[in-house]
Structure formats: C-alpha cells, structure tokens
Amino acid sequence: MSRSIKKGVFLHKSLFLKIKNNKLENIKTWSRNSTIIPDMIGININIHNGKLFKKVFIVEDMIGCKLGEFSFTRKFKSHSKKIKRKKK
C-alpha cells in the first residue's frame, strides 16, 4: 500500500539536511525508509543494511523508491543444483 498523497513523501530530517549541505560527498544513513527525491540525483549514499554500509549511486530511475530497496539485508545463497545421474 502506498503512502497518502496528502501526507507526501517521507524523508528523514537529518538526511534532508545532509543532502542540501553536502551535495558532492558521500552521505551515510541508517534511514532505509526514506524516499528518493530529485535532489538526490548524482549523489553517493551509503545505506546501512544491518551489518555494514552499501554504497549506492542515485540515478534518475530511482526517484520515488525507498533507499532500503537498493541495500539488501539478507544474502541470497543459490538453491542447490540437481545432479543428473547416468542411467545404466
């Protein structure tokens, strides 16, 4: 379910201030639920995934998505492959 238009997008206050002040530097954030806005285009943001920070470069196609969508919290291990046996 999407957020109400009346409320607007969510962007953490401290993250918004960092974007306005430090346009060119890397920004560290723990706010995975913040929405990507057009002011963030071209910025490297380090998003915390629970263990370490993942570096994400913001491009135009990401606008409207949440920051957490680009920093996975779980590591996917592939499913086991079935071994084909020769018939006798």
Curated annotation (Swiss-Prot):
InterPro entries linked to this entry: Ribosomal_uS19, Ribosomal_uS19_bac-type, Ribosomal_uS19_CS, Ribosomal_uS19_SF
GO cellular component: cytoplasm; small ribosomal subunit
UniProt keyword annotations, A-Z: Ribonucleoprotein, Ribosomal protein, RNA-binding, rRNA-binding
Transmembrane portions of the chain: none
Any one biological process term the GO annotation gives: ribosomal small subunit assembly
Family note: Belongs to the universal ribosomal protein uS19 family.
Protein name per UniProt: Small ribosomal subunit protein uS19
Protein encoded by which gene: rpsS
